[in-house]
């Protein structure tokens, strides 16, 4: 290929076509992009070897780590990507002595557009699913069917070119991801208890503190243990916000609140911050000099010249930096994206379904007339104000479920309550789409109908590959009439889009007022 890099896996890809040349819109350099492609090619080689060899638990973990590493805004470090690729190649030779070629990923990018599109859906879907399986594994939970599917899907990237079979594999990816999200839900709740509705302040108290970003609740728990009694407060950031709902985490009195808003605002919000930031997963953006000496990474996250906390999870350097920085001299008042001073979280499936009878009764009495799921990934595009405008325009007799970092567009709005039930219910992280699905399925069961027959509209925002696997799960479940934005994925070809529209009526977001009117059956 003539382009120095080729990447179109995220929503902000250049001109909604592809990133090429010297760097991507996310800040990933071309050499890192090419190294990540080589890593995927090596994983495909490993998957082929596993068909004849003897993969072990360590092989499975390496596959998860490799796929997770290539998710958008996880790894900007060409050196560590190449180290991981070498590890994958060594593992391939360990499990199977005969020679097996790796895959040249440019073959995928140069394939016919429909085949490329279907294989991209599978590849990006298993990247997202690998993140969920990786987090579950950190808590001691794994599933042989889920693990086996990664190998099957990777082999199909090279070896399957029948569009009908690939389409079935796309839906199979959604099916297996549903099982994987259930696995992670079980891992989280067994470890930390079922989330409970919790008010989370956005004000940062004076004194030393640490900001924890990403999704890894296990890393947060370890940091809370290591900082207990040391006069250091802990604040969540972005997708770590739902941690406040878990009893096993909120019991730590120094888990104080949430710092800032969506991940895309971190470069301005972290400017001259008098505290360290720990990234446990995505989304890390190119780090600016005004705070670079205070950023630490762990797990799959890697960025050149930053201090990385290894598998021993000794957070002493982070703790020392917090004490050195000292924090703010006085309490610092921060707000959400709409000016709110607090947000709520903890409305996972157990919390909501414990009030299912009450919700059903409110529907029957006409006090709740429609449900919305407004959530998904956030991002920098100005058009994402659509989601805020949509939520603001919803009538007072409607309930809104939200999740993932897209929640920051709406989670500090005061939309009131319906008989004591907040109109905005934050289900949790992106993987807690599982909770939203469980809630929808339970409501459908209560009303004796399908999810598609409920007064429910899904208004989804996407950015990276975890959103892809969630979308595939919704398609596997047969859920239709999804509004998807702020743009449709560049990797979905017109032919594949036609299939999705015909079978599922996926519709791009347009105008919040007209989309809302259609959802409510108004002209």
Task: Walk through the language-model features, giving the residues of each.
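Anaerobic metallocofactor- and corrinoid-dependent redox/one-carbon enzyme cores
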Residues: 2-32, 36-38, 44-45, 168, ...
């Amino acid at each position: 290929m003539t382009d120095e890099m080729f990447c179109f896996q995220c929503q902000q890809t250049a001109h909604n076509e592809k990133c090429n040349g010297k760097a991507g819109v996310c800040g990933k350099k071309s050499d890192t992009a090419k190294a990540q492609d080589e890593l995927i090619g090596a994983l495909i080689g490993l998957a082929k070897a596993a068909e004849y060899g003897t993969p072990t638990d360590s092989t499975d973990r390496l596959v998860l780590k490799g796929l997770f590493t290539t998710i958008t805004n996880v790894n900007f470090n060409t050196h560590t990507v190449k180290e991981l690729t070498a590890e994958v190649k060594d593992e391939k030779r360990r499990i199977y002595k005969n020679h097996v070629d790796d895959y040249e990923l440019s073959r995928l990018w140069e394939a016919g557009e429909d085949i490329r599109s279907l294989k991209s859906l599978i590849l990006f879907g298993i990247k997202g699913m690998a993140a969920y399986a990786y987090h579950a594994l950190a808590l001691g939970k794994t599933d042989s069917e889920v693990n086996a599917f990664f190998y099957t899907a990777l082999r199909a990237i090279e070896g399957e070119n029948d569009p009908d079979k690939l389409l079935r594999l796309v839906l199979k990816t959604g099916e297996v991801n549903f099982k994987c999200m259930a696995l992670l839900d079980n891992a989280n709740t067994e470890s930390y208890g079922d989330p409970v509705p919790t008010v989370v302040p956005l004000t940062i108290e004076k004194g030393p503190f640490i900001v924890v970003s990403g999704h890894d609740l296990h890393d947060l728990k370890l940091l809370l243990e290591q900082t207990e009694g040391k006069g250091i407060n802990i604040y969540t950031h972005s997708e770590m916000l739902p941690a406040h709902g878990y009893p096993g985490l909120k019991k730590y009195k120094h888990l104080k609140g949430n710092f800032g808003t969506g991940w895309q605002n971190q470069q301005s919000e972290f400017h001259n911050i008098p505290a360290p930031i720990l990234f446990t997963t995505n989304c890390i953006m190119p780090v600016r000099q005004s705070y670079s000496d205070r950023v630490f990474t762990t797990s799959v996250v890697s960025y050149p010249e930053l201090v990385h906390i290894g598998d021993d999870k000794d957070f002493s350097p982070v703790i020392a930096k917090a004490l050195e920085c000292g924090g703010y001299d006085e309490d610092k008042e921060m707000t959400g994206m709409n000016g709110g001073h607090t947000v709520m979280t903890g409305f996972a499936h157990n919390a909501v379904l414990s009030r299912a009878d009450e919700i059903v009764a409110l529907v029957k009495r006409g006090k709740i007339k429609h449900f919305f799921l407004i959530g998904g990934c956030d991002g920098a595009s100005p058009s994402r104000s659509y989601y805020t405008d949509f939520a603001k325009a919803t009538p007072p007799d409607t309930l809104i479920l939200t999740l993932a970092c897209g929640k920051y567009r709406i989670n500090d709005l005061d939309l009131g309550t319906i008989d004591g039930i907040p109109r905005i219910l934050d289900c949790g992280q992106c993987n807690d789409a599982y909770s939203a699905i469980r809630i929808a399925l339970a409501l459908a069961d209560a009303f004796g109908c399908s999810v598609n027959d409920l007064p429910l509209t899904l208004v989804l925002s996407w950015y990276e590959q975890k959103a892809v696997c969630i979308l595939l799960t919704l398609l596997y479940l047969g859920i239709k009439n999804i509004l998807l934005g702020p743009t449709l994925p560049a990797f979905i070809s017109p032919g594949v889009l036609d299939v999705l529209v015909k079978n599922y009526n996926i519709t791009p977001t347009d105008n919040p007022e007209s989309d809302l009117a259609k959802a409510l059956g108004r002209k």
